[in-house]
């Protein structure tokens, strides 16, 4: 947004491409920002105003004024750097259960709830997302529904003859793998261990963090009613796919994917050749980690499956011990597929760290303890890595496991706790005094997958709150939850069907659906790639609505951008089309949602 608040026109080459319409308080978003789901009665209820809140009133559902904002309750933050919004903060204090709105002159907030179970449905929606991402199954009623809307897939997807070819023989089709289960990674139908393994692990961690929140018959999935918490049934769908990609040697293959990109769907119409990529030490380490944890979580429910996970994890760990160098998976010539951790700029340090941590935690393996000692002494294990997080570096999880361990040497635990406290203090300071919306992201943190990365920071805070018994860390983590659900510069929830969330999300199988399926967390502000949308305000580098027509005349649909011949021209904006549906800010991913579930379980 320019300094005078005017909407900028984006020009690519000789063609005017789109209009950037960043969030402007009181123009296209509310000037009073709330968590659009609500607040538990016992929590602080901080609201962000972009107008002076003195004299503002809180009204109940009947329009009656229940409280008036006094000057003593107002924190004048000033200009928020990441949004360029003027900000005042107010804690509404005690409110009885009910539905409320806030008014300040002509400005008004969205409605919000106060109550003891205000987030119950949000947590269910975040988990339900995974059912809609399942592959190798039809999606049928009564399961593929949400609040009266159906999202059906007539037949099982990706069970055709061209599934499972070994990429090491490419382009010949010689050897074939038998694969089962799994989730589509994002809007495309490809599947990757580097994302599926930490996704599954985050779901298991969520269950262990707060098991009382997760029950059987909670998610309305086919396995509901079997006596196992539904979150564990859903997670198993990912685990069985991971298990199917292990070689006899113990190493894991990296992914199951097409060479280019999958078509737009529905998923059961995709008959593209699907290849099993080569072996990868990063994939092996991440698989070892999640399977080790699964071996303990599933034992009370299915000892045979727990034993299978344990055997696979131990076999993978033995391979890692015998092969200390980074083995990178390769891809087919001219392939568009990402290599995740095996891209040249990444390494397998974080993956091996969490593998050692989980191997120690599950099995008490002495070799794993030795690797933990080496990892914590490595310069790559530092506060910045714990603080930053990301799917490519799971060091923060390794630190968390060691910091909460009761059997490792005290010096090792203290080292991990020192890193954890340093990261948590940095995040807490940012939340309490560095950002007007109480966001843990710095101005340079608004890049691809911002919302997921923000939740990773929130999880660091929840672990620190537990380890150090520090309520301020938990409060800071809850602030990130509020940011995701609407108390942000863009004024809406980043989760479909949760609070005032996106009404369209193009980049998925149901991209034409209005409303979309529940619980999908969008990527969020992406200043690195989409900074032109809000040149001075990185927190607003996404568009707050999606128009039905596209400038190019191409109908808005799930993956319209993949039809654009000039896809990568113009700095991430396909020429001749609107930018609103662009995947750099709207694409979901299973790891995003796993972080959403994990943080939800950890803050509630």
Provide a role label for each language-model segment.
Residues 1-3:
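Short beta-strand-plus-loop segments that form exposed binding edges in beta-rich domains
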Residues 36-105, 110, 128, 133-197, ...:
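Aromatic (Trp/Tyr) and acidic
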Residues 205-237, 270-275, 293-310:
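Short coil/linker segments at helix-helix boundaries
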Residues 377-386:
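Solenoid-like repeat scaffolds
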């Amino acid at each position: 947004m320019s300094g005078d608040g005017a909407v900028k026109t984006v020009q690519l080459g000789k063609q005017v491409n789109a209009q950037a319409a960043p969030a402007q308080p009181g123009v296209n978003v509310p000037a009073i920002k709330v968590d659009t789901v609500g607040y538990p009665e016992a929590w602080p209820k901080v609201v962000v105003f972009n107008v002076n809140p003195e004299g503002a009133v809180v009204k109940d559902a009947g329009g009656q004024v229940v409280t008036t904002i006094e000057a003593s309750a107002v924190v004048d933050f000033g200009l928020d750097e990441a949004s360029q919004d003027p900000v005042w903060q107010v804690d509404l204090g005690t409110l009885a259960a009910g539905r409320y709105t806030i008014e300040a002159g002509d400005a008004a907030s969205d409605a919000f709830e106060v109550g003891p179970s205000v987030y119950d449905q949000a947590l269910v929606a975040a988990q339900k997302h995974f059912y809609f991402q399942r592959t190798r199954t039809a999606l049928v009623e009564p399961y593929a529904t949400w609040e009266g809307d159906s999202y059906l897939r007539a037949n099982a997807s990706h069970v055709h003859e061209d599934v499972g070819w070994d990429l090491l023989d490419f382009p010949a089709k010689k050897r074939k793998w038998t694969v089962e289960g799994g989730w589509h990674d994002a809007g495309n139908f490809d599947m990757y261990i580097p994302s599926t393994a930490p996704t599954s692990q985050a779901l298991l961690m969520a269950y262990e963090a707060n098991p009382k929140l997760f029950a059987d018959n909670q998610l309305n999935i086919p396995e509901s009613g079997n006596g196992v918490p539904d979150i564990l049934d859903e997670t198993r769908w990912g685990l069985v796919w991971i298990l199917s990609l292990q070689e006899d040697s113990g190493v894991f293959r990296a992914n199951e994917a097409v060479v280019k990109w999958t078509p737009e769907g529905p998923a059961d119409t995709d008959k593209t050749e699907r290849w099993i990529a080569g072996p990868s030490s990063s994939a092996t380490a991440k698989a070892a980690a999640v399977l080790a944890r699964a071996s303990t979580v599933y034992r009370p429910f299915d000892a045979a499956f727990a034993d299978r996970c344990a055997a696979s994890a131990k076999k993978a760990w033995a391979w890692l011990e015998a092969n200390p160098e980074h083995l990178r998976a390769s891809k087919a010539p001219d392939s568009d597929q990402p290599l995740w951790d095996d891209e040249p700029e990444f390494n397998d340090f974080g993956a091996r760290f969490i593998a050692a941590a989980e191997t120690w935690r599950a099995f008490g393996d002495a070799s794993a303890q030795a690797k933990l000692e080496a990892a914590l002494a490595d310069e790559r294990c530092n506060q910045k890595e714990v603080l930053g997080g990301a799917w490519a570096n799971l060091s923060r999880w390794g630190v968390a496991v060691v910091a909460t361990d009761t059997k490792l040497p005290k010096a090792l635990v203290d080292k991990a706790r020192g890193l954890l406290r340093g990261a948590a203090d940095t995040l807490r300071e940012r939340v309490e005094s560095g950002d007007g919306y109480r966001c843990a992201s710095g101005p340079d943190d608004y890049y691809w997958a911002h919302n997921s990365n923000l939740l990773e920071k929130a999880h660091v805070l929840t672990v620190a709150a537990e380890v150090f018994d520090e309520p301020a860390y938990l409060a800071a983590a809850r602030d990130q939850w509020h940011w995701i659900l609407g108390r942000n510069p863009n004024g809406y929830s980043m989760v479909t069907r949760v609070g005032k969330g996106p009404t369209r999300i193009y980049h998925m199988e149901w991209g034409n659906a209005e409303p979309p399926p529940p619980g999908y967390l969008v990527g969020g502000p992406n200043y690195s790639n989409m900074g032109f949308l809000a040149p001075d305000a990185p927190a607003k580098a996404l568009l707050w609505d999606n128009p039905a027509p596209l400038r190019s005349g191409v109908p808005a649909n799930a993956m319209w951008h993949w039809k654009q011949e000039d896809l990568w021209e113009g700095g991430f904006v396909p020429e001749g089309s609107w930018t609103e549906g662009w995947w750099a800010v709207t694409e979901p991913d299973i790891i995003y949602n796993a972080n959403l579930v994990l943080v939800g379980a950890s803050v509630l």
